[in-house]
C-alpha cells in the first residue's frame, strides 16, 4: 500500500475508536469517520448500502471536528452473522460471531465505504498490530496483553491488511484512557462486556427460540447420556448447552458431570467427568493463513483454542479433504466445535480455522 493520506476510520461511539481517530488527525492524515449500523431495520427489504453524511465532534477542540458518515449494514449483518450463528447452534456447534463479523461485515463494509468516498485506507480501534515484511502483510498481538484482539482477526485477508491501520496496537488501555483525557474526547467509556451484541442480556436460549420458533419442538426432551451410554436424564435442547458446561444439567451424580459432546442428529447430550474434557487432537476446516502460505506438510506452531487460552506448541498437518489435523504437546480442556483454533509464531498471527471436532 502506498502511503495513505485519506483515512476512513470506523467509529463505535466508544473511547477506543475516538482516540484512534484523534491519533490519526494528530499524525496529519485527512480523516473521515463512518459508523457501521449493524442492528437497524433488520426486517427491511434489501437495498445497496449507501452512505448518509453527517458530522462528528470527537472532542471540543476544532481539529477533531471531522466528517462523519453512517452505513446501514444491518441486512448484511443478518445474512452473514446472525444466520451463521443460528445455523451453528442448530448443528450442535458453538459459534464465534465476532470473528465472522470482523471479516464479512466490518472490514468489507469499511472498504466499501472507503471506495465510495475516495479514502485509500481504513482504520479501527482494535488492539492489534500490523506490519509489512518479506512481501507479506502481517498481523501481530497488541501491546496490551489484556486487551489484545488479534485472536478475533485471524480471518482477515492480505487485501484487508494492506488497506488497514491499527493506531492503538502499541498502546495499553490505561494509555488510551489518558490520551482520551488529553484529547478532550467526548465518547463515553463503555462497560467491558463479552456479550454478543444481538443477544439481549446474554440470554442465548430466549434469543434462539425467538429466531427459530420451530426449535423448541425439534430439540426438547432429548436424552442426556453418560460415558457408558446410559440415559441419565433429559435436556431442554442441545443448542442451549456447550462443551465443558457443568451447571444447569439437571442430573445428579456422585462426582460433577460436564458436557463432553453435543449430538445434533440424535438430539443427545453426552456428559462425563472433568478428565473426559481433556484432549490432544482436533480437526479444523475453513482455514485462513495470514503470516504464511497454507502448509503442504506438517509444521510446528503455537495454537490457542479460545480467546483467553494460552498458546501451546502443536503440530499442524494438512489433510487431503482440505481440513487440518492439530496435535498439541499438552492436552487442552473442552475443545469446542464451532470455535476457532488460531496459530501464532511468538506475537504474530499466522492463521486459523474453525474446529470441527476434538479427540
From Swiss-Prot:
Gene3D superfamilies: Adenine nucleotide alpha hydrolases-like domains, HUPs, Translation factors. InterPro entries: MnmA-like, MnmA-like_C, MnmA-like_central, MnmA-like_central_sf, Rossmann-like_a/b/a_fold. Its EC number is 2.8.1.13. The keyword tRNA-binding applies. GO terms for molecular function: ATP binding; tRNA binding; tRNA-uridine 2-sulfurtransferase activity. One of its GO terms (cellular component) is cytoplasm. It is an enzyme of class 2 (transferase). It catalyses: S-sulfanyl-L-cysteinyl-[protein] + uridine(34) in tRNA + AH2 + ATP = 2-thiouridine(34) in tRNA + L-cysteinyl-[protein] + A + AMP + diphosphate + H(+). ATP binds at residues 10-17, 36, 125. It is found in: Cytoplasm. GO terms for biological process: tRNA wobble position uridine thiolation. NCBIfam families: PRK00143.1, trmU. Catalyzes the 2-thiolation of uridine at the wobble position (U34) of tRNA, leading to the formation of s(2)U34. PANTHER family: MITOCHONDRIAL TRNA-SPECIFIC 2-THIOURIDYLASE 1 (PTHR11933:SF5), TRNA 5-METHYLAMINOMETHYL-2-THIOURIDYLATE -METHYLTRANSFERASE (PTHR11933). This is tRNA-specific 2-thiouridylase MnmA. The gene is mnmA.
